[in-house]
Amino acid sequence: MVKQRDTLTSLSQGSAHEAGRSNETDQQREANRALVAQVHEALFTGHDVSVLDSGFSPDFIEHSPLVKDGLAGLRQLVSDCPDMRHEAVRVLADGDLVAIHGRFTGLAETPLVGFDIYRVAHGRIIEHWDGLVPEAPPNVSGHTQLDGTIGPGEGDAEANRIFITRFFTETLIGGDYSGFRRYTDGTNFIQHSPDIGDGVDAVIAFLDDLAAQGNRLEYQRIHRTVAEGGFVLTHSEGSISGRRHAYFELWRVVDGRLVEMWDAIPEVPQDHEALHDHGIF
């Protein structure tokens, strides 16, 4: 009886410890989300460059092909773009990464939509990647690049990350587009890409047509993922017609099935052609 009581006590203490760690992780994730959302808004909409000192690490690493190195590059960007504004639509937090899906105006003649990924360390932003493309009209199914489901929901982020990584490896890196049937319900798929309509048939036909024209979307590797609830953002590298591209693709999973996606797929320079020495990925 004593041994049984000791075992139960040990299990109880272990469960409490795990719950404490989980709560601590949740708190850190929410702190990172709040930091990035506040700093991003203050800098790119409010043009408050003081956040470069309060919210960024002095050793900040910039990977964006649009910005020169470090904090000086961000300061110059804000100075050069007095009409710049940003509308955040989705903000995902996962460990030390926070991803923002939204729309920039004032950076170019046409609004730009896409993704920013930030890495946070010790309460400061330490690293940043982005992928932005020109805003396009709604696709043939009436969806824009930003509308649709907003919140991540209550899904199992780690299970969904594994699911999407497996789908991505088989279907996009491996080029077996029938994966869109295996990982969805086989028919339904909500599409926010400007060039493709809804449905599994539409996305497979689009990818097959590109391949037949010699313009296959080539995927080489996933560099990072940001998963929260039913959302998984993949940041990957590849090429189209021999030109290097970054693939930012946001997937939504419901009950173990792929149901919706958004993307931004900009052409990017080779690392030695970038405005900095940190590489694009």
Give the positions of each predicted feature.
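C-terminal and inter-domain tail/linker signature
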Residues: 2-281
